[in-house]
Amino acid sequence: MKIHFIGIGGIGLSALAKFLANDGHQISGSDIKQTEITNDLALNFGAKITIPHHADAVEGVERVIYSAAVRPNNPEYQRAKALGIELLSRKASLKTILGEKEVYAVGGAHGKSTTSAMLASIIPNSNALIGAISKEFGSNVRYANNNKVVFEADESDESFLNSNPYLAIVTNVEPEHMEYYEYDEERFYNAYKNFLTLAQIRVINAEDPFLASLDMEVIKLFPSKDITNTEFVLVNGTPHTKFTLKDLGNFEVFGLGDHIALDASLAILGALALGEKIENIRANLLHYKGIKKRFDIVQNKENCVVIDDYGHHPTEIKVTIKSLKTYQKLRGFKKLQVIWQPHKYSRTIDNLPAFVECFEGVDELVILPIWSAGELEVDIDLKGAFSRYNLHMADKVTRKDGVVQIIQDNNIITEYREDLITAFGAGDITYQIRGEA
């Protein structure tokens, strides 16, 4: 089938496109700009890519799948509708793509990409569709010629309800994307309950208050008592976490922090329930190498480490700051310098007090302009809100010859040459800190 994707450069839609290309479909797609992802699709998956969107791109295709960011006034959407081509949102398309598969779905407010990638490492003969790039297989997709699919299930638009889970793992539940749920908390929590109900096997973090309240048959992880002997170590300068899980013995995994042990433990319990052997699980977990943009070490010098992290919610950032302080101590760095690009005006406003708290313990904080993600601009006094910090307000950052430059009004206002530097955000900060912007 000829399938066209509007917004193919997004991490979620590109995963579906690659998966369907591997399944034998002829794919094409469009986006507003050329990126690493669109280049990969063109070079390695035979996709015809149109930049920017153009109505002619849908000529001759049989199905159009579009991202949540696409509006009805998009020229390709309009042309497809006029031509009577089948139009499916990403959410709606999941039913046709995953309907016949044995899906191992991972949901949750935080940690779902990490847990999904770990589960994919533990079950190496599975397909994988993840909302991030696994460093083990260098992609957000892995193809296996069978029915098993590790799938990162997205709650932001209730699309996880279309994921056909055989196994459902939920890391935690916290109100997010509430604009989609019309700020109706009951609807939000019911979506998670329904997601778990769909599955044959359910694994939960039983210390999450909402998950603990559910009356259904589940495999429960109690992190505070089931995970013991946690130890953080460096292996060739990279962070690893060692821990003991219940009576299953010792495990080691790439990454740093109690949350890493928690995510790994959920993946281990899920794999065990699927019938994987414990010694295979222990060995395969060591193949996990982290995921791009999560505690992602993009520069590793003896006197200066630069980390890129996708964290864009205060809970995520607070947990990662704790891990960064541990890593700082292990590496013997004097200072932790953090750059933050807030993501969405709505999220920044809804969580402002928590954002102010979550950077506690950093030595310097740089705040960049809010990445709008298509939202209308709102005036927020971030300089005033974060005045207690050693603060720099800047327009952008870049990295040249191992030096991170902080830029305001086209002038370099400060430079970071040593110690630990970390950039947080889900916008284009990842390209800035990598020196690719």
Labelled PLM ranges:
Residues 1-36, 42-49, 60, 64, ...:
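ATP-dependent carboxylate-amine ligase
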Residues 12-16, 112-118, 136-138, 262, ...:
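Short glycine/serine/threonine-rich phosphate/pyrophosphate-binding segments
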Residues 19-25, 57, 72-218, 271-272:
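Phosphate-binding loop of NTP-binding sites
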Residues 50-53, 89-92, 129-131, 206, ...:
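Beta-strand->loop->alpha-helix junctions that form or flank phosphate-binding loops
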Residues 64-67, 151-152, 170, 204, ...:
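Redox-cofactor binding/interface segments in oxidoreductases and associated redox assembly factors
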Residues 69-71, 111, 155-158, 174-176, ...:
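Short glycine-rich anion-binding loops that position phosphate/pyrophosphate groups of nucleotides
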Residues 162-177, 210-212, 252-290, 420:
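A conserved, hydrophobic alpha-helical segment in the catalytic core
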Residues 251-256, 304-308:
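Short pre-catalytic strand/loop immediately N-terminal to key active-site residues, enriched for Gly-Thr
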